[in-house]
Amino acid sequence: MAYAYGQCTWGVAARMNQLGLKLKGRNGEKISIINTMGNGQDWVATASSLGGETGSTPRAGAIVSFVGGTHGTPAIYGHVAFVEKVYDDGSFLVSETNYGGNPNYTFRKISQADSAISFAYTCLLYTSDA
């Protein structure tokens, strides 16, 4: 993996790899993340440019990008995290690395999506008929 260990981009790429996920294309195709997805705030825009399905609603398994300078993120780079769970009230739990400079995986509950947050949706790399 070409992302620097402990950076937010590394954390999301590693989590997707661990779960066997790809980006979900607008037509249902599976799209690999690339080594040049950009800074955290760029991931959803890059996913869209690759044909990925994106939106403003959290879904479990989605990539979430935060605009730089919002939600406690660096102004220049923004942040990217992985949506682990969505709650009935619209809040969602993310796993992430390098939030607040911590290179380890941490979890954080986001109260709701807003205009500084966007999502790229994922799908399983392999499916079973069993």
Model-derived regions, located:
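Secreted/periplasmic proteins that engage bacterial cell-wall peptidoglycan
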Residues: 1-85, 95-96
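A broad, low-specificity signal marking well-ordered, structured residues that form hydrophobic/aromatic
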Residues: 81, 92, 117
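Short, conserved beta-turn/loop elements at beta-strand boundaries and strand-helix junctions
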Residues: 86-90
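Short solvent-exposed strand/turn elements
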Residues: 91-111
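Intrinsically disordered, low-complexity, charged/polar segments
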Residues: 106-125
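Conserved small/polar residues in nucleotide/adenosyl-binding loops
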Residues: 126-130
